[in-house]
UniProtKB/Swiss-Prot annotation:
Its cofactor is [4Fe-4S] cluster. SUPFAM superfamilies: DNA/RNA polymerases, Ribonuclease H-like. Zn(2+) binds at residues 1012, 1015, 1026, 1029. The lineage of its organism: Eukaryota, Metazoa, Chordata, Craniata, Vertebrata. Binds 1 [4Fe-4S] cluster. Its EC number is 2.7.7.7, 3.1.11.-. The gene is POLD1. This is DNA polymerase delta catalytic subunit. The keyword Nuclease applies. It comes from Homo sapiens (Human). Gene3D superfamilies: DNA polymerase family B, C-terminal domain, DNA Polymerase, chain B, domain 1, Helix hairpin bin, Palm domain of DNA polymerase, Ribonuclease H-like superfamily/Ribonuclease H. A motif (Nuclear localization signal) lies at residues 4-19. InterPro entries: DNA-dir_DNA_pol_B (IPR006172), DNA-dir_DNA_pol_B_CS (IPR017964), DNA-dir_DNA_pol_B_exonuc (IPR006133), DNA-dir_DNA_pol_B_multi_dom (IPR006134), DNA/RNA_pol_sf (IPR043502), DNA_pol_B_thumb (IPR042087), DNA_pol_palm_dom_sf (IPR023211), DNA_pol_type-B (IPR050240). Disulfide bonds: none annotated.
Length: 1107
């Protein structure tokens, strides 16, 4: 019998879906693709070094580094920011792009042109940013105080203002929550002004309002509460005051009043600011104090659209955990921290640093620094952060793991100077728990690490919020967006690598560097930073709000800005979940398979267009009976399909229509500039801007419909959807009435489906070109029947088209060229859904390709039958059977038992550290169990299934996963009854392989008996064959040896595939990436090899005649 072969490449090896997947003739060890990239980065960086500046910059930074923290030899001059020249505040302005605006309460500072500083504490706004030259800036903005409004009660005059201020001050000082630690008056001023509420059209114009200015932002809430309860005013009793704009954040209030938007450029004019040269409060290179009214805000247009050379740092850590236990900061050490730094606008990282515990072999293209003590390692990284001074910090899951782990570990080891990771001197970074919940994402429990002055952009959180994927592991998203795989090492194996030698620690460092490099690649590829900067500019909110807050603050900011120009105020509404409203219209689909072109007509920006066309806004809403009371004529207001009334633009133009007009016209300008622009960086900015403008316009409608929100208005949201339903129905009627045989067309048109903002029309023509021409003609003709700016546009043609049901269809999409389809488009089908196993998506996609592209229904049916046969005979790889579902809430909060929830609970009992947590996607497969056992009890971890050889419930996958999707596709073609008979019954379903597991059930009590390999007869001895098959023993032996050889060859191919991916052909494969099908295949073949070798041993040792 042959011995086990050495793993090596074989002929016909399929390339792995990774970089470096080609086979070489020799298997000599060579660097991985990532290591070659690192070396190339080093060469590119060497070309840009400025040798004459290095010594000067190095000396300046060493003066600020505490003795013993980082040796001078360990600091690379390239880490440092350029040294700013001397700046004269009297003659030179300070111009910088602000990235973050927050506030603190502290002692007042003297500023040029400002009043003498008061003795008590005052709120100071703080803007962090970067200049064009790359210098870091912190600007302290003084003199701005928080305020809010309230309507003046009847009879209130100037003589009552002093009395109200005294009474409110007294009430706040007595208040248990508001009056603590007050050193001066809480209310600074009460002023009379003329304003108008934005909610509803009243017809009487502005009315008296009180503007109440308080000393500190935290005093707004108690002042509002006490005013709502009632404050005594001499001669007026104890009236109650309704608050307006009392729920606006202090930073938003300041930015609205000064016309500052997120991430725009600010200018401190010469002579108007003071530089702090000594006693600086931050670690920024330039620190200034200025009066709030002297700050100049540049709109992000033209040259002010540029983005400063921001410093982006991506990092990853590795910990040495104990076997079977996820690392815990109280017990398990941090063994490596790898960092990559990028200057925005440059092609490659300028900084590649690996900090390791214990010696590590050199890595070409990266700087390696080793430490014997973990405390020194942690302190070195903390000092490195302060030296490198990043503006943006990114990574993968740094928010919930890396940063909290580092801070907790430093506390455990009592590294007192570690947690100063922000830009404010002496301010520790701390950890707090946070929870976010929405209808779209469910509940997510996260941690928040404060790092004042630096923007945290965790790529995992970005992807969870912006993209719907089957898996969110770094490996899965890297393949999905970058087409790259990475080695994925289990936390228990990391400890073995650390305890090895300097070469194994080098392998771990390369792995850690790549884990830091990939988030940086994702940040660039998905334009995350550029898009976030442009969204902050468009909506006017600080960058951090986009990453940590919901959608509503973006619309509130725009609403406040527009309202301020018109003297309107936003009321504080106590929102409670109210009544729901009818959504968009869906025209009943005419189901079937269409072998003729189907033209799709789409309303451009439907909901924003409706709001602009019909002037739907808070400011134009008429309460029931108001139109008659104000004497409005029929041509001065409209009645919507839902019965609500709004005044027309001739009476008052609404705020929301004005905001939408500005957004959409700005988008049109951005797209026009984008078409002409050639500079790649500027193209990125413009593309991000037009996308931000589009998203912002579409979110305005959602803001009005949010039942629990800042300013919900059911009348607006239900009127918008009411008009939408009416327009879809009218479009159907217009198309079907014009394009008829009676009007001279070859056939009469029919609308086969309509959904929200689009209709699908069958014009009866046979060619795509004719359908396109008629679609464009129909879109122009129908648009003329609707008020501007509502416009119906021709979008695409489907040919052929498979219409299955509401929101479920597929077809070949033609949008520009009639002679070549763009792609196969699927909506609502399992080909694009992520709540089924990959087998479903792959089979549905393959079937659709055969039906729509190849036009081969028989081939599609045959392929589906083959896959079903393979499934029932256990020939499908387990990676194709993995189902993933998100854990959105605790087990007790689910109404019924869920498979992924129950599995998460079982995994938590096995290993609490590595069990899924809220917000994670849980992978599982369904295993066989006794008849009648519920599906949620049969869910199991795929790796656990492989390790314990548990049998898969193939019948479940056929009936619960494959059956319905396949019938939906094939019934329109084969007919309802025939589709089921052909696909789910027949010869291909009669042959089944039933496997038995090694553990559980009756097998725990059963005694195993050997069977004859030839005829399966139960044997009474330990041999391989029975007496009847003895003459065929040699033949049977050769057959099993051949099977073993085939398994060894398959294992060899898979093993070498994985070696290629990890970048070494002479090291063991330790990757355990559950998102890679090769991993499951390799585990399965290894198990099959062990079983086959055990079977061959039953034949006994070869006799002398074999030699």
């Amino acid at each position: 019998m042959d011995g086990k072969r050495r793993p090596g490449p074989g002929p016909g090896v399929p390339p792995k879906r990774a970089r470096g997947g080609l086979w070489d003739d020799d298997d000599a060890p060579r660097p991985s693709q990532f290591e070659e990239d690192l070396a190339l980065m080093e060469e590119m960086e060497a070309e840009h070094r400025l040798q004459e500046q290095e010594e000067e910059e190095l000396q300046s930074v060493l003066e600020g580094v505490a003795d013993g923290q980082v040796p001078p030899s360990a600091i690379d001059p390239r880490w440092l920011r350029p040294t700013p020249p001397a700046l004269d505040p009297q003659t030179e302005p300070l111009i910088f792009q602000q990235l973050e605006i927050d506030h603190y309460v502290g002692p007042a500072q003297p500023v040029p042109g400002g009043p003498p500083p008061s003795r008590g504490s005052v709120p100071v706004l703080r803007a962090f940013g970067v200049t064009d030259e790359g210098f870091s800036v912190c600007c302290h903005i003084h003199g701005f105080a928080p305020y809010f409004y309230t309507p003046a009660p009847p009879g209130f005059g100037p003589e009552h203002m002093g009395d109200l201020q005294r009474e409110l001050n007294l009430a706040i000082s007595r208040d248990s929550r508001g009056g603590r630690e007050l050193t001066g008056p809480a209310v600074l001023a009460v002023e009379l002004c003329s304003r108008e509420s934005m909610f509803g059209y009243h017809g009487h114009g502005p009315s008296p309002f009180l503007r109440i200015t308080v000393a500190l932002p935290r005093l707004v809430a108690p002042a509002r509460r006490l005013l709502e309860q009632g404050i005594r005013v001499a001669g007026l009793g104890t009236p109650s005051f309704a608050p307006y704009e009392a729920n606006v954040d202090f930073e938003i209030r300041f930015m609205v009043d000064t016309d500052i938007v997120g991430c725009n450029w600010l200018e401190l004019p010469a002579g108007k600011y003071a530089l702090r040269l000594k006693e600086k409060a931050t670690q920024c290179q330039l620190e200034a104090d200025v009066l709030w009214s002297d700050v100049v805000s540049h709109p992000p247009e033209g040259p002010w659209q540029r983005i400063a050379p921001l410093r982006v740092l991506s990092f990853d850590i590795e910990c040495a955990g104990r076997k079977g236990i996820f690392p815990e900061p109280e017990r398990d050490p941090v063994i490596q921290i790898c960092s990559l730094g990028l200057r925005w606008g440059e092609p490659e990282p300028f900084l590649r640093l690996a900090l390791t515990l214990r010696p590590c072999a050199p890595i070409l293209g990266a700087k390696v620094q080793s430490y014997e003590k973990e405390e020194d390692l942690l302190q070195a990284w903390s000092t490195f952060i302060r030296i490198m001074d990043p503006d943006v910090i990114t990574g993968y899951n740094i928010q919930n793991f890396d940063l909290p782990y580092l801070i907790s570990r430093a506390q455990t080891l009592k590294v007192q100077t570690f947690p100063f990771l922000g830009r404010v001197a002496g301010l520790c970074s701390n950890i707090r728990d946070s929870s976010f919940q929405s209808k779209q994402t469910g509940r997510r429990d996260t941690k928040v690490v404060s790092m004042v002055g630096r923007v945290q952009m965790d790529m995992l959180q970005v992807l969870l919020r912006e993209y719907k994927l089957r898996s969110y592991t770094l490996n899965a998203v890297s393949f999905h967006f970058l087409g790259e795989q990475k080695e994925d090492v289990q936390h228990s194996i990391i400890t073995d690598l650390q305890n090895g030698n300097d070469q194994t620690r080098r392998r771990l460092a390369v792995y850690c560097l790549k884990d830091a490099y990939l988030p940086l690649r994702l940040l660039e590829r998905l334009m995350v930073l550029v898009n976030a900067v442009e969204m902050a500019r468009v909506t006017g909110v600080p960058l951090s709000y986009l990453l940590s807050r919901g959608q509503q603050v973006k619309v509130v900011s725009q609403l406040l800005r527009q309202a301020m120009h018109e003297g309107l105020l936003m009321p504080v509404v106590k929102s409670e979940g109210g009544e729901d409203y009818t959504g968009a219209t869906v025209i009943e689909p005419l189901k079937g398979y269409y072998d003729v072109p189907i033209a799709t007509l789409d309303f451009s920006s439907l909901y924003p267009s409706i709001m602009m066309a019909h002037n739907l806004c808070y400011t134009t809403l008429l309460r029931p009976g108001t139109a008659q009371k104000l004497g409005l004529t029929e041509d001065q207001f409209i009645r919507t399909p839902t019965g609500d009334e709004f005044v027309k633009t001739s009476v008052r133009k609404g705020l929301l229509p004005q905001i939408l007009e500005n957004l959409l016209s700005a988008r049109k300008r951005a797209k026009a500039e984008l078409a002409k622009e050639t500079d790649p960086l500027r193209r990125q900015v413009l593309d991000g801007r037009q996308l931000a403008l589009k998203v912002s316009a579409n979110s305005v409608y959602g803001f009005t419909g949010a039942q629990v929100g800042k300013l919900p208005c059911l009348e607006i949201s239900q009127s918008v959807t009411g008009f939408g339903r009416q327009m879809i129905e009218k479009t159907k009627q217009l198309v079907e009435s014009k394009y008829t045989v009676e009007n001279g067309y070859s056939t009469s048109a029919k609308v086969v489906y309509g959904d929200t903002d689009s209709v699908m029309c069958r014009f009866g023509v046979s060619s795509v070109a004719e359908a396109m021409a008629l679609g464009r003609e129909a879109a122009d003709w129908v648009s003329g029947h609707f008020p501007s700016p509502i416009r119906l546009e021709f979008e695409k043609v489907y040919f052929p088209y498979l219409l299955i049901s509401k929101k479920r269809y597929a077809g070949l999409l033609f949008s520009s060229r009639p002679d070549a389809h763009d792609r196969m488009d699927c909506k609502g089908l399992e080909a694009v859904r992520r709540d089924n196993c990959p087998l479903v998506a792959n089979l549905v996609t393959a079937s659709l390709r055969r039906l729509l592209i190849d036009r081969d229904p028989e081939g599609a049916v045959a392929h589906a039958q083959d896959v079903i046969s393979d499934l029932l005979c256990n020939r499908i790889d387990i990676s194709q059977l993995v189902i993933t579902k998100e854990l959105t809430r605790a087990a007790s909060d689910y109404a019924g038992k869920q498979a992924h929830v129950e599995l998460a609970e079982r995994m938590r009992k096995r290993d609490p550290g590595s069990a899924p947590s809220l917000g994670d996607r849980v992978p599982y497969v369904i295993i066989s169990a006794a008849k009648g056992v519920a599906a949620y009890m049969k869910s199991e971890d795929p790796l656990f299934v492989l390790e314990h050889s548990l049998p898969i419930d193939t019948q479940y996958y056929l009936e619960q996963q494959l059956a319905k999707p396949l019938l939906r596709i094939f019934e329109p073609i084969l007919g309802e009854g025939r589709a089921e008979a052909v696909l789910l019954r027949g010869d291909h379903t009669r042959c089944k392989t039933v496997l038995t597991g090694k553990v559980g059930g009756l097998l725990a009590f059963a005694k195993r008996r050997n069977c004859c390999i030839g005829c399966r007869t139960v044997l009474s001895h330990q041999g391989a064959v029975c007496e009847f098959c003895q003459p065929r023993e040699s033949e049977l032996y050769q057959k099993e040896v051949s099977h073993l050889n085939a398994l060894e060859e398959r294992f060899s191919r898979l093993w070498t595939q994985c070696q290629r991916c990890q970048g070494s052909l002479h090291e063991d494969v330790i990757c355990t990436s559950r998102d890679c099908p090769i991993f499951y295949m390799r585990k399965k073949v290894r198990k099959d090899l062990e079983d086959q070798e055990q079977l061959l041993r039953r034949f006994g040792p070869p006799g002398p005649e074999a030699w």
